[in-house]
A protein has these predicted regions:
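Nucleotide/phosphate-binding catalytic cleft detector across ATP-hydrolyzing
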Residues: 7
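Rhodanese-like catalytic fold shared by cysteine-dependent sulfurtransferases
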Residues: 21-22, 26-62, 71-104
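N-terminal signal peptide c-region/cleavage motif recognized by signal peptidases
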Residues: 14-16
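Positively charged n-region of N-terminal signal peptides that target proteins for export
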Residues: 1-4
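Short, surface-exposed ligand- or partner-binding patches at beta-edge/loop junctions that are enriched
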Residues: 66
Length: 104
């Protein structure tokens, strides 16, 4: 019985570790193609409302948005929050994100 309880407790506390995290680059495709964060997907700001549900179907997943300097990603954060996404972070500009970059 103790082992089952310990296993259940371990699983409960490990759930956030497995929560999905999505990085969204809200810049225009040309900028994304020049350089972007590794693993990020490109959804330009003006297309966020139309395309986000396909990229991030679970509104409880963590969504981190970035752009060039943080202004457009701030707008994207507001849009996503209004759409019901619960864990949205404005990660700022490309130079601010702590992830490897992909060029070209």
């Amino acid at each position: 019985m103790f082992k089952k309880g310990l296993l259940a407790l371990t699983l409960v506390f490990s759930l956030p570790v497995f929560a999905a995290e999505h990085w969204i680059d809200v810049r225009v495709p040309e900028q994304y193609q020049q350089e972007h964060g590794q693993g990020a997907i490109n959804i330009p700001l003006k297309e966020v409302k139309e395309r986000i549900a396909t990229a991030v179907p679970d509104k409880n997943d963590t969504v981190k948005v970035y752009c060039n300097a943080g202004r457009q990603s701030g707008q994207a954060k507001d849009i996503l929050s209004e759409m019901g996404y619960t864990h949205v972070e404005n990660a700022g500009g490309l130079k601010d994100i702590a992830m490897p970059k992909v060029k070209g």
